[in-house]
A protein has these predicted regions:
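Flavin-dependent oxidoreductase catalytic cores
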Residues: 1-150
Length: 150
């Protein structure tokens, strides 16, 4: 599908990150797409590409035109307030990874307690087991620096 001319003009000539941004822009106006979820590693970091210097990475994507395509992202969303800030920045939904591993009920906790935060890392193997993680997954998580206490 072709993009609207206005969307093309907004992102043309922006250098190195243009290809990925152009692809996201095309998806956000594609009537076959219900939602686009992005793993940004840190939804609040600034863009490293010189063409977008000083802009929050999230803003680069939330400013793109959307035609009924919901936009979500993951990346260091470790508290209810961080999730709320990401939504306020223009996302339609958020995805939690590590926070949901550390707290299987993170979404419920975040919705009912605006001050809820993920427990500080590292966490114990017992804590992860209590969240429903199996021994093999806990062993895998132990390979992540600073995630599982020795």
């Amino acid at each position: 599908p072709s993009m609207e001319p206005a969307a093309e003009m907004e992102i043309s000539g922006r250098g190195h990150g243009e290809h990925k941004l152009l692809h996201a822009a095309e998806l956000l106006v594609d009537p076959r797409i219900d939602y686009l979820d992005m793993s940004l590693w840190d939804v609040f970091k600034d863009v490293h590409d010189a063409a977008f210097a000083g802009e929050p990475l999230l803003k680069v994507f939330t400013d793109l035109p959307r035609k009924g395509v919901a936009l979500g992202a993951a990346g260091k969303l470790y508290s209810a307030k961080a999730c709320e800030a990401a939504i306020a920045s223009g996302l339609d939904f958020v995805l939690v990874g590590r926070a949901a591993v550390v707290h299987a009920d993170f979404p419920r906790q975040a919705l009912t307690n605006a001050n809820f935060e993920m427990q500080a890392l590292p966490v114990t193997r017992d804590h992860l087991a209590a969240q429903g993680l199996g021994p093999k997954f806990i062993d895998y998580m132990a390979t992540w620096d600073g995630f599982v206490a020795a």
